[in-house]
Amino acid sequence: METLFNGTLTIGGRDQESTGFAWWAGNARLINLSGKLLGAHVAHAGLIVFWAGAMNLFEVAHFVPEKPMYEQGLILLPHLATIGYGVGPGGEVVDTFPYFVSGVLHLISSAVLGFGGVYHALIGPETLEESFPFFGYVWRDKNKMTTILGIHLIILGIGAWLLVWKALYFGGVYDTWAPGGGDVRVITNPTTSPAVIFGYLLKSPFGGDGWIVSVDNMEDIIGGHIWIGTLEIFGGLWHIFTKPWAWARRAFVWSGEAYLSYSLAAVSVMGFIACCMSWFNNTAYPSEFFGPTGPEASQSQAFTFLVRDQRLGANVASAQGPTGLGKYLMRSPTGEIIFGGETMRFWDFRGPWLEPLRSSNGLDLNKLKNDIQPWQERRAAEYMTHAPLGSLNSVGGVATEINAVNFVSPRSWLACSHFCLGFFFFVGHLWHAGRARAAAAGFEKGIDRDNEPVLSMRPLD
């Protein structure tokens, strides 16, 4: 237990002496006060939703329609655009009002959650078990804990189905692969084949396989949400109506801190997946809104110079580069025709502006000579100058690259931030899992505070 250093610091039964935790231990003081812990969680949800609403309106207020979203440091409007709000052909923003509505709805929701959080933190009952037994719980009540797990799963499943309904019945979603450079379309034939959907999970995460990050069409994305939403709803019902089996009761640690550690591990995994998805995937994260991926920017540069030099009379099929390999085109390890030069490392890149120029044997020479469309040239030139090179605390671009635009790509920011957050959540998982296991084993004594510097410091008040 924590050592008391200021006996006057008492707050409604949540003082250090009665709980074993000091004020800075936060919600640990509320482990046995279900009503107050509810208040803390509802208030936390209110803060999250407030940020979403406020940041949403901030982005709307600063949005410049003439510039691409990814050049303006936006991270919320690209998501709203991806699910089909306010955009038209080619990802052009045609109406910002839906974005404004989204921000206002989130702000209103945050006010409701904020009121509920303050109410339960200050006014509501300290514990729920007596007044509202349905919402009350004991951490060691295994049946109640799995019931709560089930309720959470059902809510997550409904969330997945909301995207499905939006894609199928409420205006559709933005599909970067729509002919002519992307458009909003209704998904009429989502993939429901378990072989396809679960095939992604069985793929290798390495190389060109890419696990679930390799998804490259909206039908599979929406079909995946049908599967995950349905499984979560049925899994939730299962956990509500059943009791944990004997092996599960023995295998898990059943305490508040253990559940915290499980949750942190789950969020950590989701953070790492989001990191990879936002960095590599240009279907769930359309390049029109989030900017090109690294391989995409590289391939688009090779394509842009191929177009330029071909117009100047170069024979792009036979020109040699300084290494003796093809300057513009060469063969991949599997015999396909690919772009030559440094971008050969990204030979398995797939993008909606490039795929029309392929045939069964890679890039089609006849199409490259006769079929390149103006929108493909414009898209490639734009992506070439917007490689995702910035980091969390830097400007973008390369100092020696005269074609680079100085900006920080949302892909850089989202990938870097989610990796960092995923890592810290994983460390939090290890910390709380270790404490929970030690407490369950009976040798958790806490940290020795006898010689802690804070003991000799002046009290806060």
UniProtKB/Swiss-Prot annotation:
One of the components of the core complex of photosystem II (PSII). It binds chlorophyll and helps catalyze the primary light-induced photochemical processes of PSII. PSII is a light-driven water:plastoquinone oxidoreductase, using light energy to abstract electrons from H(2)O, generating O(2) and a proton gradient subsequently used for ATP formation. One of its GO terms (biological process) is photosynthetic electron transport in photosystem II. It is a multi-pass membrane protein. PSII is composed of 1 copy each of membrane proteins PsbA, PsbB, PsbC, PsbD, PsbE, PsbF, PsbH, PsbI, PsbJ, PsbK, PsbL, PsbM, PsbT, PsbX, PsbY, PsbZ, Psb30/Ycf12, at least 3 peripheral proteins of the oxygen-evolving complex and a large number of cofactors. It forms dimeric complexes. GO terms for molecular function: chlorophyll binding; electron transporter, transferring electrons within the cyclic electron transport pathway of photosynthesis activity; metal ion binding. It comes from Pleurastrum terricola. Residues 1-2 form a propeptide. Its main location: plastid. Gene3D superfamilies: photosystem ii from thermosynechococcus elongatus (1.10.10.670). Belongs to the PsbB/PsbC family. PsbC subfamily. Binds multiple chlorophylls and provides some of the ligands for the Ca-4Mn-5O cluster of the oxygen-evolving complex. It may also provide a ligand for a Cl- that is required for oxygen evolution. PSII binds additional chlorophylls, carotenoids and specific lipids. It is found in: Plastid, Chloroplast thylakoid membrane. The modification N-acetylthreonine is found at T3. GO terms for cellular component: chloroplast thylakoid membrane; photosystem II. InterPro entries: PS_antenna-like, PS_II_antenna-like_sf, PSII_PsbC, PSII_PsbC_sf. Pfam families: PSII. This is Photosystem II CP43 reaction center protein. The lineage of its organism: Eukaryota, Viridiplantae, Chlorophyta, core chlorophytes, Chlorophyceae. HAMAP family: PSII_PsbC_CP43.
